[in-house]
Amino acid sequence: MSLLNDIPLTALHFYLTAPYACSYLPDLQARSQVATPAVLIGTPVYSELVQHGFRRSGAYTYRPHCDDCRACVPLRVPAEQFTASRSQRRAWAQHAHLQASLHPLLDSAEHYELYQRYQRARHPNGGMDNDDCESYQNFLLQSQVDSLLVEFREQGVLRMVSVIDLLSDGLSSVYTFYEPDLPRARFGVYNVLWQIELCRKLDLDFVYLGYWIKHSRKMAYKTGYRPAQGLIDGIWQPLGKEFITKDAHGNL
C-alpha cells in the first residue's frame, strides 16, 4: 500500500463528474473519475494512481470513466525494451543539437508566449488556444508531485518546453509544446525519444504517455513507440502489431 506521510491510499475519495463533451471523439459525451483531496496525492500515491490509469491536469487527478465508451487506453513504453524506428532515428539525429536544461516548474513569459503560439497553430478552436495566463499556470505549473520543466534551446532560442512528472517506476509525460512555425521540424517525436532516454539514465522502467485513442488523430501516434503497453481491463499488456500507427507520411 502506498503511503504519503503515513496517509493510506484508501484515504482518498473518488467521484464521477457530470457528462461533458468529449475533447477527442466528436458527438460523444465523456465522464471522468476524480481522486480527491489533492493535498493527499503526493508522488508515492500518484505513482500508484498512474499505474491504474490516472493522469493529472494541474492538481486535478482523473481518469476517463465514460458510460458507454472505453476508447481511452492508458499507454506506457518500457524504456529498456524500446527500439526506435528508422523514422524516429532520423528525428533524433535531426534535433540532436538541441540543448536541454532541467528546471523546477517556473512561470516564464517566454514559455507562455510559445505556448500560445503552439496552441493557436496546432489546436485552433480546441479551447486551449484561448488560455489566459492563469489557465496556463493552473494547467502546467500547479503540481502536488515531483515535477520538472525541461527547456530545449537551439543556439539560445527556445524551441520546446516539456513538463514531466517523476514517478516511482518511471516518468509521466504531462505536456509538451514547441515552436510551430518550423514545418520540417519533428520536435514532438524527438521529445518522446528524449524522455525515454532520460528514463533509462534514471534507471526507471516506463514512460507514461497518457491515453491512446484509436480513432483520434491527435492521440493515435502514441502506438508508434514500440513496444507499447496498454492498460486494458485493468491489466497492462503489450499492444500488438495491429495497433501500430503510421504518421501522415506513412512512417512508423
Identify what each model region corresponds to.
Residues 1-104, 205-252:
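Terminal substrate-recognition subdomain of acyl/acetyltransferases
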Residues 49, 115, 192-195, 222:
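Residue-level preference for non-acidic, small/hydrophobic
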Residues 52, 193-205:
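Conserved acyl-CoA
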Residues 55-68, 74-184, 224:
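A conserved beta-strand-loop-helix scaffold within acyl/acetyltransferase catalytic domains
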Residues 165, 190-193, 210:
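Active-site scaffold segments
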Residues 171, 179-186, 202-207, 211-215:
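Nucleic-acid nuclease catalytic cores
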Residues 184-196:
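Conserved acetyl-CoA-binding loop-helix of GNAT-fold acetyltransferases
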